[in-house]
Swiss-Prot record:
Ubiquitous. Residues 36-82 form the F-box domain. This is Tubby-like F-box protein 11. Pfam families: Tub (PF01167). It comes from Arabidopsis thaliana (Mouse-ear cress). Transmembrane segments: none annotated. Gene3D superfamilies: Tubby Protein, Chain A. Residues 250-289 are annotated as: Disordered. It comes from the Eukaryota. Residues 273-286 have a biased composition (Low complexity). Belongs to the TUB family. The gene is TULP11.
Length: 389
């Protein structure tokens, strides 16, 4: 999110919440300086102009850490607000830095996003919804482009809509389908095996600036998506299953913890790892020795009056489409130690995707998957399935 939207959204909270923040700030010191008071009570119009200039200095995209620290140093009230924004999305529900796109979403809510499709350029843009309206401009998060090959199709995912090169630092991963469009593999272009990364960083001769750009980038499988045969063709609901290779079932337990990367690796670091080094990725982590999490789509019900298959998207989907789906933890992934009954666990939506316009779709996701993983799964829904439809 932009600094402007973060601060203005927090300042627009109910008066009681703002008062609590002020009281907490006052508790840090017996007296609050007049300068702190002036900054905390600055008119919203003037605050907006200041933040616009700060965003312009950052290039209009993601806020730099320098800008976040500078805002935190303005006064105690701003420091408390900034403390909330830099917490991981699992707790704050905020996407403050690019690495937030690779971190799990919130546990108790869903991050509301939407996808815009361009049929001419075969591109897809993911935006973060800044309001409850389905028509807002949103904050750009990720972009993807479709590349057709003889035996497969690739969806290249990037941090920039104007740079889809796999050799770019903006490259974050890809989705590859088989010829029939029934099986997909999600590759993470920024995931480093712990052993290989440690050796590179400890090496005295390692210099990222001197690494040849011709060395192929490493991509590591993090999820497998499967669409099953639909006997009703395009008239019936799709049946899909997602095997999350890097997310163990224990993350669904009350005290479960999902892995949270803290930064993107340097391009040079990523380039020097060969594809063969990605094979021991699963065994290199104690987390991945457990059974991986399996997500399956929630079965829709047939509505006799409307004569269509229905799911409750709580107003987030307005157009009936075979692409619409909701993902929940599969029964085998719930486990007996989750502290939650299988019936209740099956009602917890982890990812939902649906159509709201000709080329507009909503995407809402939550813990334990990230925005990148959710976007990759949704991209698979756009592919034509020769064997299923």
């Amino acid at each position: 999110m932009t600094l402007r939207s973060l601060i203005l959204e927090m300042r627009s909270r109910p008066h009681r919440v703002v008062h609590d923040l002020a009281a907490a700030a006052a508790a840090d010191s017996t007296s609050v300086s007049s300068q702190d008071y002036r900054w905390s009570e600055i008119p919203e119009e003037l605050l907006r102009e200041i933040l616009i200039r700060v965003e312009a200095a950052d290039g209009g995209g993601w806020p730099s850490r320098r800008s976040v620290v500078a805002c935190a140093g303005v006064c105690r009230g701003w420091r408390l607000l900034m403390n909330e924004t830099v917490v991981v999305p699992e707790i704050s529900s905020k996407l403050t830095f690019p690495i937030s796109l690779k971190q799990p979403g919130p546990r108790d809510s869903l991050v509301q996003c939407f996808i815009k499709r361009n049929r001419i350029t075969q591109s897809y843009h993911l935006y973060l919804g800044l309001t409850n309206s389905l028509t807002d401009d949103g904050k750009f998060l990720l972009a993807a482009c479709k590349l057709k090959h003889t035996t497969c199709t690739d969806y290249i995912i990037s941090l920039r809509s104007d740079d889809m090169s796999r050799r770019s630092q903006a490259y974050v991963g890809k989705v590859r389908s088989n010829f029939l469009g029934t099986k997909f593999t999600v590759f993470d272009g920024n995931l480093l095996p712990s052993t290989g990364a440690a050796k590179l960083r400890k090496s005295r001769s390692y210099n990222p600036a001197k690494v040849s750009a011709k060395v192929p980038l490493g991509s590591y499988p993090v999820a497998h998506i499967t669409y099953e045969l639909n006997v009703l063709g395009s008239r019936g609901p799709r049946k899909m299953q997602c095997l999350m290779d890097t997310i163990p079932t224990s993350t669904m337990e009350p005290q479960g913890v999902a892995s949270e990367p803290s930064e993107f690796p340097l391009l040079g670091t990523r380039s020097t790892l060969s594809r063969s080094q990605s094979k021991p990725l699963r065994s290199s982590s104690s987390h991945l020795k457990e059974t991986p999490l399996v997500l399956s789509n929630k079965t829709p019900r047939w509505h006799e009056q409307l004569r269509c298959w229905c799911l409750n998207f709580h107003g987030r989907v307005t157009v009936a489409s075979v692409k619409n789906f909701q993902l929940v933890a599969a029964g085998a992934s719930c486990g007996s130690g989750t502290g939650m009954s299988p019936e209740r666990q099956s009602e917890r939506i982890i990812l939902q995707f649906g159509k709201v316009g000709k080329d507009m779709f909503t995407m809402d996701y939550g813990y334990p998957i990230s925005a990148f993983q959710a976007f990759a799964i949704c991209l698979s829904s756009f592919e034509t399935r020769i064997a299923c439809e």
